[in-house]
Amino acid sequence: MNAAAPPVIVPQADPGASYRAQKAAIDAAVARALDSGWYILGKEGAAFEAEFAAWQGARRAVGVANGTDALALILRGLGIGPGAAVATVSHTAVATVAAIEMVGAVPVLIDIEPRTYTMDPAELAAVLANPPPGLPPIRAVIPVHLYGQPAAVAEIIRTAGAHGAAVIEDCSQSHGALI
């Protein structure tokens, strides 16, 4: 009788690798925040916002608890809520759809472009040109940049703009990715 070979485990990710590589800096920043007593809106948060904005080439950045809150705040800032629909890609984290539902809007899932797994601009154009019956107006489009793979933003912006919809890029999984 042959013994079964032990299973081969292929590691998919090492979430701790980034921390280990930056351990001293991260631990020092956490210690400074804890020592200051300012866990929210303190110097460390302000420094992070300034550094992140500079890294992105933006004038400002606002730190929030998570990507869901960020998307919900942007949607609210655009006045999007009940009576509106928001298109996003079908291949995304639940957080993207949760943000749309948090503001009372209706999520509309757009199929992927098979090569990139990001929003298919042609599918978006088809839905915007011929929305399903009874769907509220699509007031915003949220393409999601996944795994460092940017969506076809220029084409999505043109398509959404032609239909009066704002574009909100969900970059929570692709900070620093380039088109």
What are these regions (language model features)?
Residues W38-A85, H91, A99-M102, L109-D111, ...:
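Phosphate-binding glycine-rich loop
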Residues D27, A31, E49-A53, A72-R76, ...:
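Solvent-exposed, non-membrane alpha-helical residues enriched in polar/charged side chains
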Residues M1-W38, K43:
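N-terminal "arm"/small-domain region of PLP-dependent enzymes with the aminotransferase-like
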